[in-house]
């Protein structure tokens, strides 16, 4: 099974997303998505997200900034192996936001949830952002009334 991580990065009421590269070895080229990547063998998912954010945005995170909130299992004809993706929320500081340097992907965008809904997005990354926004940040009930 292939493991990966994704970061729902937020600052105030805005989310930091990326436009994915058009490189041929990238899944979902040219779509929007969250920052993240593969988990190395023997690596814990929380360490992986901190490493990936350092590699992609050149910022250092405190270990406690990464808060696990969702795991999505993916079994698709488009992938040779089943996949699992772990999502972490990352509330960033103004200093971290201002010091970011994009190292991977085409571009980064700090936008609100309404604009995110209008973009062509990696399907499970969009699900993770929407779930986080409505059921964790806004604390809507998941249970039936």
Locate each region found by the language model.
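Nudix hydrolase/Nudix homology domain
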Residues: 25, 29, 101-145
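The catalytic Nudix box helix
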Residues: 34-69
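Conserved N-terminal beta-strand and adjoining loop/helix that marks the start
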Residues: 1-17, 35
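A structure-centric signal for secondary-structure junctions around beta-strands
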Residues: 2-4, 12, 28-29, 84, ...
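Short, charged/polar surface micro-motifs in flexible loops or helix N-caps
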Residues: 10-15, 23, 40, 74, ...
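Short secondary-structure boundary/capping segments
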Residues: 7, 23-25, 77-80, 99-101
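Active-site-adjacent beta-strand/loop module that shapes the phosphate/pyrophosphate-binding cleft
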Residues: 2-3, 70-97, 109, 113, ...
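N-terminal first-folded block
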Residues: 17-19, 23-35
